[in-house]
Amino acid sequence: MTARQIQLGDITFANDRPFALLGGVNVLEDLDFALRCAGHYKQVCERLGIPLVFKASYDKANRSSIHSFRGPGLEAGLQILQAVKDTLGIPVITDVHSPEEAKAAAKVADIIQLPAFLARQTDLVRAMAETGAVINIKKPQFLSPEQIRNIVDKFRECGNEQLLICERGTNFGYDNLVVDMLGFGVMKRTCDDLPLIFDVTHALQCRDPGGAASGGRRSQVVDLAKAGMAVGLAGLFLEAHPDPNQARCDGPSALPLDQLEPFLTQVKAIDDLVKSQPMININ
């Protein structure tokens, strides 16, 4: 099977090409924070030769508690993302939570993301598809790798073929996620070898059964990222923070920002090795 390619400016997403990074922060806090984090990502990725799309959310609409920080909102958040693009000259990705937001988000974001918890919402899929933007489809935690094909088909039937598919872990009993490495190949085969992204930081989430926020296992981010890269990915999805313990959302899963360069150096070495080898197809 020939790997499908999705083009975003100078970035080519394909499972047999050098990986791209969808990297950034979980949620926008303010403009200075966004520029500081995005600037660091840009410097590191330029040194390592890794294509970058900066990720940040303007609204975390699915927080566990009504009191949790959600972000600056659609209008202010998109202004911050536009400032990041204009100042640093890098593409951006953000997630969309309602059909009404899709068109506005796609005017700023180069990639718009379908959240895992909302991935079966047909009205949202249709609205996102109709923007014509590149779409990153998060596989829901509650679906098998094969079932993501149904979401892909919805987008295609709505006229959008500019699709990335993203693994972010699967429910394992209550309050825990695991990543099934066999599922990567299943997703590729089921979806005609669309570019596959691995969301390594959200896959590290775990919950306190009585808590109102997600916990995480960021100490294992290197292990999980290396394992994922070994199967041949089009991209890695990563969230980092200058001080994860003070992050407004998902700090327990976030990579410390000062560890970004050594982390990506090791991840890139594995990707380079994997992509330098001939593909072995076993039926």
Swiss-Prot record:
Gene name tied to this protein: kdsA
Family, similarity comment: Belongs to the KdsA family.
Transmembrane segments: none
Reactions performed catalytically: D-arabinose 5-phosphate + phosphoenolpyruvate + H2O = 3-deoxy-alpha-D-manno-2-octulosonate-8-phosphate + phosphate
InterPro entries, per the entry: Aldolase_TIM (IPR013785), DAHP1/KDSA (IPR006218), KDO8P_synthase (IPR006269)
Subcellular location: Cytoplasm
Enzyme kind, highest EC tier: transferase
Keywords: Cytoplasm, Lipopolysaccharide biosynthesis, Transferase
Gene3D superfamilies on file: Aldolase class I
Its EC number(s): 2.5.1.55
Keyword check for Lipid biosynthesis: no
GO terms under biological process: keto-3-deoxy-D-manno-octulosonic acid biosynthetic process
Record NCBIfam families: KDO8P_synth, PRK05198.1, PRK12457.1
Any matching Pfam family: DAHP_synth_1
PANTHER family: PHOSPHO-2-DEHYDRO-3-DEOXYHEPTONATE ALDOLASE
Coiled coil, from the record: none
Pathway stated in the Swiss-Prot or TrEMBL entry: Carbohydrate biosynthesis; 3-deoxy-D-manno-octulosonate biosynthesis; 3-deoxy-D-manno-octulosonate from D-ribulose 5-phosphate: step 2/3; Bacterial outer membrane biogenesis; lipopolysaccharide biosynthesis
Signal peptide residue numbers: none
Source taxon at top rank: Bacteria
Gene Ontology cellular component terms for the protein in this record: cytoplasm
GO MF annotation, one: 3-deoxy-8-phosphooctulonate synthase activity
The protein, known as: 2-dehydro-3-deoxyphosphooctonate aldolase
